[in-house]
Swiss-Prot record:
This is Orotidine 5'-phosphate decarboxylase. Catalyzes the decarboxylation of orotidine 5'-monophosphate (OMP) to uridine 5'-monophosphate (UMP). It comes from the Bacteria. Its EC number is 4.1.1.23. The lineage of its organism: Bacteria, Pseudomonadati, Pseudomonadota, Alphaproteobacteria, Hyphomicrobiales. The keyword Metal-binding does not apply. GO terms for biological process: 'de novo' pyrimidine nucleobase biosynthetic process; 'de novo' UMP biosynthetic process. The active site is at residue 69. InterPro entries: Aldolase_TIM, OMPdecase, OMPdecase_AS, OMPdecase_bac, OMPdeCOase_dom, RibuloseP-bd_barrel. It comes from Brucella canis (strain ATCC 23365 / NCTC 10854 / RM-666). The keyword Lyase applies. Pathway: Pyrimidine metabolism; UMP biosynthesis via de novo pathway; UMP from orotate: step 2/2. The gene is pyrF.
Amino acid sequence: MTTELHDDASGRLIVGLDVPTIAEAEKVVEELGNAVSFYKIGYQLVFAGGLDFAKSLVAARKKVFLDMKLLDIDNTIAKGVENVAKMGVSMLTLHAYPKAMRAAVEAARGSDLCLLGVTVLTSMDNADLREAGYSDNAETLVLKRARQAHEAGMGGIVASAVEAQAIRQAVGPDMAIVTPGIRPAGSEKGDQKRVMTPADALRAGASHLVVARPIVGAPDRKAAALAILKEMRSIGRS
């Protein structure tokens, strides 16, 4: 398993295809053209034929982040990861539980699949964690899971950019830190609670930024993507 961190902004911006149909996803990709090279596919699109669409994106020389947030018994995780590795996608998420991560890392060994451990969803805050039965606050739990992901040999983690600086200090320079909840200045937060602008996220130590609604929901999607890329390039590599 390798972790490819891009200096070029176009390789660090991941557009979330959070749309209901393959036809709409195809339209987004067509409109964005060569401006975007990396796409995230999650549950909504997976259940509408998104796995085949992921393969078509790979065939078109695009990179794919398959956001499945896997969590199961070790053997089931391993068998699933083995098949995902054969698809040619670049990234796959699973929840950052030590046994699951160790099984996934072993299953992906020898492939180019970058495994990402999901720490705490960016839609959750401390009150949500307490309601779910966790005694740790968000930052404490994120750092704990980030260290566990590093120890398990994962390629990176998914976390809010709010915690990115602390994570980078904890795990060093080589792990990918993939940050959802990215909102350009003036954008609506939507259902995200721990958000940051693209520039601030990169300054904090994020390696990849996941942006969905601010691009996919924009009247001019390509212009929105190019504006974010311009902001990212103005910062350079953190």
